[in-house]
Amino acid sequence: MKRIYGSLAIAALALAATPAFAQIKIASVGPMTGQYAAFGEQLRRGAEMAVADINAAGGVNGQKVELSIGDDACDPKQATAVANKMVSDKVVFVAGHYCSGSSIPASDIYKEAKILQITPASTNIKLTDDAFAKGNTTVFRTCGRDDVQGLTVGTYVLKWHRNAKVAILHDKSPYGKGVADETKKALNKGGMREAMYEAYNDTDKDFTALINKMKQAKIDIIVLGGYHTAGALLIKQSREQGFGAQMVGFDALEDAEFAKLGGAATNGVLMSFPPKAEDDPKNAALVKKFRDAKYEPAGYTLFTYAAVKVWAEAATKAKSIEAAKVAAALRAGTFDSAVGPLTYDQKGDIKNPVYDIYIWKDGKSLPTPK
């Protein structure tokens, strides 16, 4: 009897040491502090809602999902530090980063640790091109790439402003220079040459010298490869100094903070962005949940939501959370997501991405006529 009781006691201790519901650790990483924190908030909110919905439906492969948030401040060095922390924390999946300059160095760390990465917002072509060339098959996006954005903006300028004098500006970041260079390629291929190609610092506060240079060159169109903070200051100071050139930016302008910082000067600013998922009727119930929580799911909120949900669906199909198996499942089918059907190529890019042109008016970005 003593042996039986002893065996029962050991079994009871073993059961007590095992969680009733094991946790799968995942993370979302982006700029939670600093001048791009508004975009970090989009990633955090999207990931949190996705995890809540996944767990409410029973989790992934019988396990609950535990989310942690990492702050890289869109700084490459901080991004690598955060990525290493995710490795130490035994995270199996990362929805992030936001800035391409963070996603690219972090992807090398995730590869070595066999952590699957899906970025909702990093558009630089080098992220997936270089990763694939190095044998990294566990990097994906739910967004498009700079070559598609550049072609979209370049095509728009060629169609509507072929005889204009164009200044192409960028903030020296992988993202900003990436979209600027891809737009330059599209314009040049279409027979149009830029009148100016200039770099600025994303921390600049006074753009007077640059504005004067554009005035002297009689610039009609500003193609801005950069983020919303500098973009808002540039357009505001341009209008204050009597410079009325049309600004055309990219997806990094897509936050209400752009209009708050730039005020009325942002009216008429154009930008590229994917079709807005928050306006899709099929997402009405999901959008309502965000709004009930007092948050407007603009920008890359639903792209992050989609990244987490697509990972969960692929892990379920693979019956595994191992990065290689989940990656194979992602490439094997089409996933119906909040941002539309997602089908992946061998590099981890979505097939047939779409960007539209939007115009800022009274604090909101609205579709332009097709």
List each language-model region with its residue ranges:
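Segments of small-molecule ligand-sensing domains
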Residues: F290-T301, V310-T368
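Hydrophobic alpha-helical segments within soluble ligand-binding/sensing domains
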Residues: A79, R141-K165, D206-F207, G231-A232, ...
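Sec/Tat signal peptide C-region and signal peptidase I cleavage site
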Residues: T18-A22
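Extracytoplasmic "Venus flytrap"
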Residues: A27-G46, G70-K77, Y98-G101, L169-K177, ...
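Beta-alpha junction/loop-to-helix N-cap segments that form part of ligand/metal-binding clefts
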Residues: A38-L43, A57-D129, Y200-F207, A232, ...
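Extracellular/periplasmic periplasmic-binding protein-like sensory domains
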Residues: I235-Y305, K364-T368
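Extracytoplasmic ligand/sensor domains, especially the bilobed periplasmic-binding protein
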Residues: S88-M196, Q246-G268
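Short beta-strand elements in bilobed, periplasmic/extracellular small-molecule ligand-binding domains
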Residues: V60-D72, G135-T138, N188-D202, S272
